[in-house]
Regions:
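Active-site-proximal alpha-helical scaffold in enzymes
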Residues: 36, 40, 44-47, 54-89, ...
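Domain-wide signal for the mature, well-folded portions of proteins, strongly enriched
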Residues: 24-25, 33, 90, 124-127, ...
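Conserved active-site "lid/cap" helical segment
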Residues: 1-3, 7-8, 66-70
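Acidic, glycine-rich active-site loops and adjacent beta-strand->loop/helix elements
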Residues: 3-5, 59-63, 87-92, 166-171
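Active-site-adjacent elements of ketosynthase-type condensing enzymes
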Residues: 65, 90-126, 169-175
Length: 176
């Protein structure tokens, strides 16, 4: 489990970077809370007490999918019988928004209107993976999956919601 950007608010990296400028001290929690693997590390150490593997593969907006693929491969190979895969991302802080805006990476009303050839933006069409787009829409999300090999799920009487046989992650090509 991991996030691509880590915790950037005042409790994490954002607070650590701004503390001295604001006349505050850096807390002992800001650096660890700013690590992109802290959600998994925290749950592993403080909730589950697990001695199993923890780690992450970060890949921008596909971070969850990269980690899901690793878990599926571990279960299919027999290295693991159960895996918890997750991601939580909350990058809506002014510095991140300004950073993406400076890169012209965000979909704006002006760019949406130009792309659609209209005078008013249709925000429902702002996110268009693998298609013509004018940037992306910054958002927050969180999801966690518990994966088990077939026999373990049946032995435990687990309620099975889906099967993940493979995971495909593809980039969406050249950007304009």
């Amino acid at each position: 489990a991991a996030s691509a950007m880590a915790q950037l608010d005042s409790n994490g990296t954002g607070g650590m970077l701004q503390a001295r400028l604001r006349g505050n001290r850096v807390s002992s929690k800001q650096l660890p809370l700013g690590l992109n693997t802290m959600p998994a590390d925290f749950i592993n150490a403080y909730v589950l007490g697990s001695v199993g593997a923890t780690g992450a593969n970060a890949g921008a907006c596909a971070t969850f999918l990269y980690n899901l693929r690793l878990a599926v491969e571990d279960i299919q190979s027999g290295r693991r019988r159960v895996a918890v895969v997750g991601n939580a991302e909350a990058p809506l802080v002014p510095e991140v928004i300004e950073g993406y805006a400076a890169m012209s990476a965000l979909a704006t009303d002006e760019k949406l209107c130009r792309l659609d050839g209209s005078s008013s933006p249709d925000h429902r069409r702002a996110s268009r993976p693998f298609g013509d787009n004018c940037g992306f829409t910054l958002g927050e999300s969180g999801q966690y999956f518990v994966l088990m090999d077939d026999s373990l799920a049946l032995d435990l009487g687990a309620q099975i919601h889906a099967a993940v046989t493979d995971v495909f992650v593809n980039a969406d090509g050249f950007k304009k």
